[in-house]
Amino acid sequence: MVATVRVEIPDKLIPIFEGEADVRGAKGGRGSAKTRSFAKMAAVKGYIFGNAGISGIILCARQFMNSLEDSSLEEVKRAIEDEPWLLAYYEIGDKYIKSRDGRISFAFAGLDRNIASIKSKGRLLLCWVDEAEPVTDEAFTTLIPTLREEGEGWSAELWVTWNPKRKTAAVEKRFSQSKSDRVKIVDLNWRDNPKFPAKLERDRQTDLIERPD
């Protein structure tokens, strides 16, 4: 008997993670749950790979990362800790996340300084680029060809999440404006988050009253 679990993410993200894709992503402001949702789904993806006997690396990248404190490490840790079945699968240390079966490990990198070294990271199963708005087109041009692993019923994917600020940003032009059916991007905002924090709601109401423009 195969056990099933319920993974809670905003309803608007469900179609993004269904079916096949080369690129999946979400753009929106704070409180939209995009970062925590993608952190959780990266851990879920690693769990699925590992239990299928597939070994490799889940890479979490940002344009700027001078140290692990600037990375998505803590987001992924918290997402795993929220789900007992994920916590049972992963071993979490101060500076690492890896599966207890030895098949899956998370890596963290800054694209501005380490983009060349990513090509030698080994078997990349997935790359999630968070805070992707400042990522350059050159970085994407280097990164995408490294996601070439594939097997029966799967291929390596690129995930992107960002707070949209410039229509000219590389992430907007490459993915948000893409017509490919293998690129799945959604706009996500605070209204789409069923767990929108009460503190952010108070801040939002204050802004509406005191800073209506």
Segments predicted by a language model, with ranges:
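Phosphate/NTP-binding elements of NTP-utilizing enzymes
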Residues: M1-D213
